[in-house]
């Protein structure tokens, strides 16, 4: 018998998560200079990292021989002050993915189910399957969550509902009132995980007061991350906010030192750097307008997005178009694993990166066999130039 046959069948059935292609990998494959490649595949911050966070992390290098504070006291204190919660309502994670996995480990067992939307974050089914749970994918409505259908899908064995707002990879946004009504209607015996990884990219008028809902709904867990607007994806820091009893259970099963010294120091400093987050938001607004304008000029359908990315429908052979982009040194994200085989997702980058993407896409559409020529206007496209400090 092969030793691997002893692993549970539900583990052996899992397909590994496929992240965006690294720049170094494409450089090796194509024999390219890494400096000539742009990566717009993983929703990373094109501005880099908060300078205050970088400074704090640099100082923390002197203590890498020591274990981190397993309780994350200073970061929890900073989060408590920022969000008006108590430290016992907080669970820290090695990125918000870690927090999602902790929720599954605590509340699921073989045969229990989770409910999530079609076209939602791939980690939801992964963490469900990893503990032997059953994932219920509810058909999307206009590429977003159909909350009424998701409520109907909740079964007696359902323990967790995942809601991404904004949603990745489609960028759709649920009005805060709709989410609140869902919380009021769903069974209090079901944990609702509200994944707000892209919250900082929302216009202020569209940000719901979800954290205030924690006082009313002990079955609500809100997850956020330092990977996106704070530009700290490489050091992996995320957090969850919930009822003290829920956070307490999750803290029982997390790894003792799941957030490292560097990440803890950087996150505390990043919370103080409000100017960097404002710049990230403004750049994203301007870049989104730049990309949307370019796609419109090419007659490309796209899904309006409230994140720092945009999914668009490719008129033709998606694989061939993506290969052409790669050969031109542009990495975007195929999203067939999200049941969107005709789409690609692009991260909003710097103005120059967005311009290179748009020009490369136009070339790919013009030169790739199988592209739908009737959707492609003349290729002498003048792409918009938008100042990085502007808004859309």
UniProtKB/Swiss-Prot annotation:
Coiled-coil stretches: none
Enzyme Commission (EC) number: 2.6.1.9
Gene3D superfamilies: Aspartate Aminotransferase, domain 1 (3.90.1150.10), Type I PLP-dependent aspartate aminotransferase-like (Major domain) (3.40.640.10)
Cofactor: pyridoxal 5'-phosphate
Modified residues (N6-(pyridoxal phosphate)lysine): 228
PANTHER family assigned: HISTIDINOL-PHOSPHATE AMINOTRANSFERASE, HISTIDINOL-PHOSPHATE AMINOTRANSFERASE 2
Name the UniProt record assigns to this protein: Histidinol-phosphate aminotransferase 2
Gene: hisC2
């Amino acid at each position: 018998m092969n030793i691997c046959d002893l692993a549970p069948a539900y583990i052996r059935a899992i397909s590994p998560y496929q992240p965006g292609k690294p720049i170094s990998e494409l450089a090796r494959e194509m024999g390219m200079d890494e400096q000539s490649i742009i990566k717009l595949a993983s929703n990373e911050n094109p501005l880099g990292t908060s300078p205050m966070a970088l400074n704090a992390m640099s100082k923390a290098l002197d203590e890498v021989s020591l274990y981190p504070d397993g309780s994350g006291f200073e970061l929890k204190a900073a989060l408590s002050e920022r969000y008006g919660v108590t430290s016992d309502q907080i669970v820290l994670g090695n990125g918000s993915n870690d927090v999602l996995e902790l929720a599954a480990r605590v509340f699921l067992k073989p045969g229990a189910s989770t409910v999530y939307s079609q076209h939602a974050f791939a980690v939801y089914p992964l963490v469900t399957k990893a503990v032997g749970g059953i994932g219920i994918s509810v058909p999307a409505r206009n590429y977003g969550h159909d909350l009424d259908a998701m409520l109907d899908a909740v079964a007696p064995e359902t323990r967790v509902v995942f809601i991404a707002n904004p949603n990745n990879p489609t960028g759709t946004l649920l009005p805060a009132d709709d989410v609140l009504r869902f919380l009021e209607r769903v069974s209090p015996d079901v944990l609702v995980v509200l994944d707000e990884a892209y919250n900082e990219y929302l216009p202020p008028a569209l940000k719901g007061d979800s954290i205030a809902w924690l006082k009313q709904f002990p079955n609500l867990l809100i997850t956020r991350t330092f990977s996106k607007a704070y530009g700290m994806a490489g050091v992996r820091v995320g957090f969850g906010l919930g009822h003290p009893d829920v956070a307490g259970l999750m803290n029982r099963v997390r790894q003792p030192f799941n957030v490292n010294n560097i990440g803890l120091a950087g996150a505390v400093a990043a919370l103080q750097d409000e100017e960097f987050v404002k710049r990230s938001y403004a750049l994203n607004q301007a870049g989104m307008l730049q990309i949307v304008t370019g796609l419109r000029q090419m007659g490309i359908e796209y899904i309006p997005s409230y994140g720092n990315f945009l999914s668009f429908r490719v008129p033709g052979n998606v694989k061939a178009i993506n290969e052409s982009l790669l050969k031109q040194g542009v990495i975007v994200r195929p999203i067939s694993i999200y049941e969107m085989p005709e789409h690609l997702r692009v991260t909003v980058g710097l103005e120059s990166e967005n311009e290179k993407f748009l020009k490369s896409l136009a070339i790919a559409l013009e030169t790739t066999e199988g592209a739908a020529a009737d959707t492609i206007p003349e290729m002498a496209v003048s792409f918009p130039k938008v100042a990085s400090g502007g808004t859309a």
